């Protein structure tokens, strides 16, 4: 299957990510792909994401050519190209959400002290600013409350694909990194970071409601600056929404 995605020159997909430096969020790239896939594939039917690698920034007015290969019950493999340049590739499986495995949710339990306002910690702005507050910190991670705003372009009909909660996890990781920098610099500093990879993401529901609290927890699994890998999970309405691993790149 071949799919052409015309990235708009501006508009809701770029609002808040990042002001003055518009970049299509990696998760938005997956939402656009999911919306373009034929049935029975589709963003709300994703049950797992074995891997995704975001290899290049997607900018306003980009023209993306997507090649999709069916793997039967194993879902799809896909490549996203801008001309000859590979900008993303990955795999998705589809079907009923996976049954929760019963693993404990990794919540950072130490109460944070003197946390600056979230907009001082990360460069995101509404409607792409999901994290609302920090509820716990640890030496290797953090737990934040987040919400997907109803006016976010990733929302349709009051809900978003469940994997959009990975953006809340990525922002939680960015908040923790900013807090970790503050003891050495004297103040927290908002720096642009990028979501560069997903691995072994298992989804326990098809969608998440907008304007509803999410609890996103991240724990550092590996670090080789400027790259970092985090084990993440997100719960909503008292139930696990997803669990997996993300990779981030901190610029500057």
Cite the ranges covered by each PLM segment.
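Hydrophobic residues in beta-strands and at strand termini
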Residues: 5-7, 54, 94, 148, ...
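Short aromatic-glycine motifs in intrinsically disordered, low-complexity regions
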Residues: 40, 115-125, 187-190
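Compact, glycine-rich, soluble single-domain proteins
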Residues: 21-25, 29-30, 156-176
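Catalytic strand-loop segment that frames the active site of acyl-thioester-processing enzymes
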Residues: 1-24, 125-161
